[in-house]
Amino acid sequence: MTGFDCWIMPTFRLASVLNFKIQEIKIMKYIIVGAVAGGASAAARLRRLDEHAEIIIFEKGEYISYANCGLPYYIGDVIKDRDKLFVQTAASFQQRFNIDVQIMTEVIAINPIAKTITAIKSPTGETYEEAYDKLILSPGAEPVRPPLPGVDIEGIFTLRSVRDTDLIKGYLNRKSARRAVVVGAGFIGLEMAENFHHLGLQVSIVEMGGQVLAPVDFPIASIVQQHIRSKGVALYLNAAVASFAKSGEAITVSLNNGKQLTADIVILSIGVRPDTRLALQAGLKTGEARGIWVNEYLQTSNPDIYAVGDAIEFKNPITGISMMTYLAGPANKQGRSCANNIVLGNVQKYNGSINTAIVKVFDLTLATAGTASKHLKAANIDHVVSTTHNGSHAAYYPNAQQMTMQIAFSPIDGRLLNAQAVGYDGVDKRIDVLSTFIKQGKTVYDLAEFEQAYAPSYSSAKDPVNMAGFVAENILMERLKIFYWNETGNIKAHDLFIDVRRKDEYDAGNIERAINLPVDEIRSRLHAIPKDTNIFIYCEAGLRGYLAQRILRQHGFDNVFNLSGGYKTWKACTDESVLIARAG
């Protein structure tokens, strides 16, 4: 008798004695609606957790699991090979994961009592029902196409799917397009503007708001706007499209300010809305933001139906306000968590998204995490904002590039609430660090202690993340009093306004009413500075202003304020404000 026999036989005898019977395991049937980000992620995870389940995924389009974030770059010929856009095909997904993939098949109804769905096949129109044990909704969002006069003219497109991409690409190949108008200056709008520019088109951007990229604050957006203009792209802010009209082979785009633009192709990139039609038909609860309501386990108001992706809403972990999150990263992670909860029994809580996002705008990179200052104000959340300008790596090592970073934090405990960064190099790795700090509820004191990998070609001994923490720490410890670019007009005639840069810098450009007193001369001229008035100081980026402030404060000058972000921030913001005002 082998050792194995010695071990196994008593086990079977014990089972026999106890009259043990192996119970038949119920084979579960999972149905998923939507096969792009969240849906495909959920399907693959379900299979990894449950090899024996029956899994059916429905996709009304022709393609599944594609890289929708890469679509603008395929249009712009940055991505040459169309096949690179597809993470999986229906056939490869089905073969690898043993999942029944039903493409060109739209789920049109849910019967939550009978636990069935009704689907319709294209192009035959055949309808049929499928039963389910658990259902996952991942219907995504639909692009907004406003009911404007002429909006259905040939050559006006939205971009959301591979089909949209093929239509745009085909149109460009058929037409000799020279001029493009992009309506909307969000992430997709700016990416499309860049890619049209890459194709050699003359590009105009029309944006109803007063800045590009609504998730960030104006001081950061102003840097992006200047960069866009430097590329020869026309930018029309505070402008809305009133109508479209055909003018021969061209399209006339009429704005509400009376201006008219001529285009050969128009992209509408003015936002998306959650696709909640199925959820509403099934009687599922929707929320304050009009998305599908889910609990912390991504479970809808029906316990057998879960939902993920662009169609759901969830409370923002910073503001507590229900919101939509139209980002691929959270959607994919939700799909995985949802599958865990279905198979393992609600074991993984979803904590919401802080909307960490990044976008390439020509040579520039902008990234954000958390809740912007303007949205914190709208939510009545008290906070302080500070801005720093630093190099992407050590200044003495070649090719260091400027990076501007703005953070928002609690004045009570220093908890980090938002981070925004813009620059040419290293923005991505800094925002990932800052996003982690925000997500974990860390403070600006933690930023000051952040330990990064350092070599002069990669960073500085005091990384830009550290510098942001140092400045915020000084503000909280009341070693640094600040004022902002849009408050310079509030400085009174009897206040003292000092530019502490060198004379040549001052002569090259300064803020009206400021006198020049270089920081290195302050100690020798203390006798000439009155102590009974407010003193407002600025330098190029903020550091020399801080040094001047510390000198004055320790010589008995109490009311000394330093301009956050310095002349760089003031200049970018005021220049853009003037351009916007003139255009309006």
Q: What is the role of each PLM region?
A:
Residues 26-102, 193-216, 349, 353-356, ...:
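Beta1-alpha1 glycine-rich phosphate/pyrophosphate-binding loop at the start
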Residues 26-28, 35, 39, 48, ...:
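Mid-to-C-terminal Rossmann-like scaffold of FAD/NAD(P)H-dependent oxidoreductases
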Residues 86, 179-180, 187-245, 327-331, ...:
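Rossmann-like dinucleotide-binding cores of NAD(P)H-dependent redox enzymes
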Residues 152-176, 248, 252-254, 259-340, ...:
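FAD-site-proximal beta/loop scaffold in flavoenzymes
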Residues 137-199, 234, 288, 294-296, ...:
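Glycine-rich dinucleotide-binding loop and its adjacent helix/turn
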Residues 52, 96, 102-123, 130, ...:
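A Rossmann-like FAD-binding core segment of flavoenzymes
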